[in-house]
Every structure is written in structure tokens, then in C-alpha cells.
UniProtKB/Swiss-Prot annotation:
Pfam families the record matches: Ribosomal_L18p (PF00861)
Domain of life: Bacteria
A GO MF label: 5S rRNA binding
Keywords: Ribonucleoprotein, Ribosomal protein, RNA-binding, rRNA-binding
The protein's role, per its UniProt record: This is one of the proteins that bind and probably mediate the attachment of the 5S RNA into the large ribosomal subunit, where it forms part of the central protuberance.
Complex formation: Part of the 50S ribosomal subunit; part of the 5S rRNA/L5/L18/L25 subcomplex. Contacts the 5S and 23S rRNAs.
GO cellular component: cytosolic large ribosomal subunit
GO biological process entries: translation
Protein name: Large ribosomal subunit protein uL18
Family indicated by similarity: Belongs to the universal ribosomal protein uL18 family.
């Protein structure tokens, strides 16, 4: 039986394999969630570069957030990464939720990124 870590890695790889099949050259909006913070970056897999990034540890967000571990913080990060991605010239991405289910903080981040101008 697989350990929790092995199962997490297997789920993340499965999601990434599905994303690469439908990406068509679009950058990937990759999300990582920890118990205290949430991190997101827009990655161009063809060039191997990060085009935009944001997290609850950003100086511009950290002072305005009560905690980095709630849906309000995730929505603020989603809006910030959308602004930075649009400024970098990215409007269409594929959403990489990794091994995390599309619920709660992940869903709040995705909806805020859509409202901020990203389409996926």
C-alpha cells in the first residue's frame, strides 16, 4: 500500500499528465497549498520559466491578511497573480491544482484568478 506522500505524488503526476495533454502551449497556473500559506505561479513549461508568482508571504499581501490559511487569503493571492500574469502578457492558462481537490482555498484562488482576467 502506498504511503500518503507516495499517493500525493501519484495524484499530482496524474493531474499534470492530463494538463500537458490539453495545454497546447499555454502556461500552467500551478498551485501549492500548505497548512499555513498558499503559493501560486504561472509557469511556461516550453521555456522552463516562471512568468508570474504570488503567495500569502508576499509583502504586499502579508500585512493586509489576518492569516494565510483561509479562503479570503487564497482569493487575494488569486487576484494578485492574475494582475501580475496579465501585466506579463498572459491571458490564457491551464489550471494545475496538483494533488489538491478543487474545493475550498483552491477553488477560491481559481475563481479570483478568473475575475482578475485569466481564462481557464
Amino acid at each position: 500500500m502506498a504511503s500518503r506522500k507516495e499517493a500525493l505524488v501519484r495524484r499530482a503526476n496524474r493531474v499534470r499528465r492530463q494538463i500537458k495533454a490539453v495545454a497546447n502551449g499555454r502556461p500552467r497556473l500551478s498551485v501549492h497549498r500548505s497548512s499555513k500559506n498558499i503559493y501560486v505561479q504561472v509557469i511556461d513549461d516550453v521555456a522552463g520559466r516562471t512568468l508570474a508568482a504570488a503567495s500569502t508571504l508576499d509583502g504586499s499581501l502579508r500585512s493586509s491578511l489576518k492569516t494565510g490559511a483561509d479562503t479570503a487569503a487564497a482569493a487575494a493571492v488569486g487576484k494578485l497573480v492574475a494582475e501580475r500574469a496579465v501585466a506579463a502578457g498572459v491571458k490564457e492558462v491551464v489550471f494545475d491544482r496538483g494533488a489538491f481537490i478543487y474545493h475550498g482555498r483552491i477553488k477560491a484562488l481559481a475563481e479570483a484568478a478568473r475575475e482578475g482576467g485569466l481564462s481557464f
